[in-house]
Curated annotation (Swiss-Prot):
This is Peroxiredoxin DOT5. Belongs to the peroxiredoxin family. BCP/PrxQ subfamily. It comes from Saccharomyces cerevisiae (strain ATCC 204508 / S288c) (Baker's yeast). Its EC number is 1.11.1.24. Residues 45-59 have a biased composition (Polar residues). Thiol-specific peroxidase that catalyzes the reduction of hydrogen peroxide and organic hydroperoxides to water and alcohols, respectively. Plays a role in cell protection against oxidative stress by detoxifying peroxides and as sensor of hydrogen peroxide-mediated signaling events. Has a role in telomere silencing, which is the repression of chromatin structure which leads to a stop in the transcription of nearby genes. Also has a role in the regulation of telomere length. Acts as an alkyl-hydroperoxide reductase in the nucleus during post-diauxic growth. The lineage of its organism: Eukaryota, Fungi, Dikarya, Ascomycota, Saccharomycotina.
């Protein structure tokens, strides 16, 4: 009987040791990390739509020297629709100067520079100011500064984008000027100061005028 008791004791100890070993080898359970919810709703969808629109607009090829003016129409300060193609059909030389925002200091210097040189420029070219400002802002700007030329409103920056004068895909315009001769882009000046824009545009217009005399 003593031998049987010792045998059962050894079996019980071995069984307990085996259970302890198995518990050591058992995989450690980790708490489940909750999945991050993706935000949805009108605001999220609206932001996504803006980004998608910006990406589409940034894919548009910029006009290069020699390219024809696009067939677009923009509103001027009087809310009249102006066809860009008709402008170039009626004028051999057309100057478009782009300014970031109406009635700001740098843009006022640029616009007034073209105003002060307008009498000479208009002998050879048509001059247009261009920005993403509203029609109302353009009218106030024109009236306050006595600007003798039209200001075109391009709130979606369609023409501004084609000219390569967008500051970012989402907003902003870069100060610049562009000169079309016989409907095609001849001069392209981007990221320049107000004074350089006026002076260079004047030189370029006079240069074209001299070539016309040789024809």
């Amino acid at each position: 009987m003593g031998e049987a008791l010792r045998r059962s004791t050894r079996i019980a100890i071995s069984k307990r040791m085996l259970e302890e070993e198995e518990s050591k080898l058992a995989p450690i359970s980790t708490p489940e990390v909750p999945k991050k919810k993706i935000k949805t709703g009108p605001k999220h969808n609206a932001n996504q739509a803006v980004v998608q629109e910006a990406n589409r607009s940034s894919d548009v090829n910029e006009l290069e020297i020699g390219d024809p003016i696009p067939d677009l129409s923009l509103l001027n300060e009087d809310n009249d629709s102006i066809s860009l193609k008709k402008i170039t059909e009626n004028n051999r030389v057309v100057v478009f100067f782009v300014y970031p925002r109406a009635s700001t200091p740098g843009c006022t210097r640029q616009a007034c520079g073209f105003r002060d040189n307008y009498q000479e420029l208009k002998k050879y070219a048509a001059v247009f100011g261009l920005s993403a400002d509203s029609v109302t802002s353009q009218k106030k700007f024109q009236s306050k500064q006595n600007l003798p030329y039209h200001l075109l409103s391009d709130p979606k920056r369609e023409f501004i984008g084609l000219l390569g004068a967008k500051k970012t895909p989402l907003s902003g315009s870069i100060r610049s000027h562009f000169i079309f001769v016989d409907g095609k882009l001849k001069f392209k000046r981007v990221k320049i100061s107000p004074e350089v824009s006026v002076n260079d545009a004047k030189k370029e217009v006079l240069e074209v005028a001299e070539k016309f005399k040789e024809e």
